[in-house]
Structure formats: C-alpha cells, structure tokens
Amino acid sequence: FVRGAGTRNPNSPLQGGLVIFAAGNEGDVYGDVRIYPAAYDPVIAVGAMDWSFRPAYYTDYGPWVDIAAPGGDRYSGKTTRTASDGRTVFYSNAQILSTILCDDAIAYQDGRKDGGMYGYGFMQGTSMACPHVSGVAALGLAYAAQNGKKYTPAEFKALLLSSVYGIDDCFAGSKDGELGPIAD
C-alpha cells in the first residue's frame, strides 16, 4: 500500500508513500532497543524531546531514530487548576495538549457526547511528538504541490531530515548522539 500511494495521480508531489511513526516510550527502561515498525529504514522514526530540547526521559533512542519533536515530559513541573466540578486537577505545563475521549477523563475542557467524555487533556509520549513531524511533512508536500515539485519518498525524507537542527548542536544530554535531529 505504501509503495503504491501517490502513484496514480501524475500531479502528486510524492511519488509513493511516506510513513512517519512514533519511536516508542521505553527508552528509560530498555535503552537502545529497536522498536518496529519505526525502526524500518523507509520509515521516519520520531523520538520525543521535552520543553528544554533534551530527550524526554521515556523516549526510545538510537541511531535508528531519525528525528525528535516535542512530546512532553510530566516531570518538568506541575501546575494545578480547579475543574468545573470543584476538583483540583494536577497537570504538567510541559506536556502536550491533545484531544481525548474516555469515560473517566479529567479533561482540560469538560464535555459530554453520547455518554462519553471528550475534550482536551495533557499527555506525553512519542505519539504526541509524531503529529508535529507529520504536520511539517504535510506542509512541505503542500508547498511542493503548489510549486510543481515532485519527490520520491526517499528524496522527501532526506529533504525533511536535512531541514532540522542536529540534536547534538542543541545540547549535550544523557542520550547525546543517540537521538535524531530536532524538528524546529
């Protein structure tokens, strides 16, 4: 399916598919262990960094991780607020605000629909970092389409990865040299 994506439309800016996948959240437990499908060569593996551009404590890492983006870090300071029902809610101002859907969620913005709670909540993980990279890739492909440019998946991956700061240029951390470039 990925090889055939974008090949039927001759005007597509990407002649094939591009897979961007979260690297995983076991780095603090297992260290440099390859997680699949993120570790496959054609895939862009996304690690997570905290608010200070350091690898998040949980992010999987290693030479197979291609890029890092903001993923949140709950240990980077906590804040409280009062929920609509009077409860004190603790959340990290260093996590990523995301949409949530679950029955017992403590949402940033409470609401009900069909008996379930929905709204926004603060979360962390490489799955919070991955949409940042996917969004930048989508913007890049939209720009390419507007300008009549065409790329193979390998060419676009190389372009995307060459347009970010190297993580070693930004800090010297505990995972120095083990996490891909920083999406800025």
Located regions from the model:
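C-terminal subdomain of the subtilisin-like protease fold in secreted/lumenal serine endopeptidases
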Residues: 15-17, 119-120, 142-184
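Active-site environment of divalent metal-dependent phosphoester hydrolases
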Residues: 26-31, 53
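Extracytoplasmic/secreted proteins, especially bacterial periplasmic and envelope-associated proteins
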Residues: 1, 41, 132-135, 155, ...
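Extracellular S/T/G-rich loop segment that most often corresponds to the catalytic His/Ser-adjacent loop
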Residues: 35-138, 142
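Alpha-helix termini
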Residues: 1-15, 72-83, 144-149
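A cross-domain feature marking catalytic cores of carbohydrate-active enzymes
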Residues: 21-23, 48
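A generic local structural motif
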Residues: 5-8, 30-34, 121
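Loop/turn elements at helix/coil->beta-strand transitions in domains of secreted/extracellular proteins
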Residues: 5-9, 13-19, 41-45, 65, ...
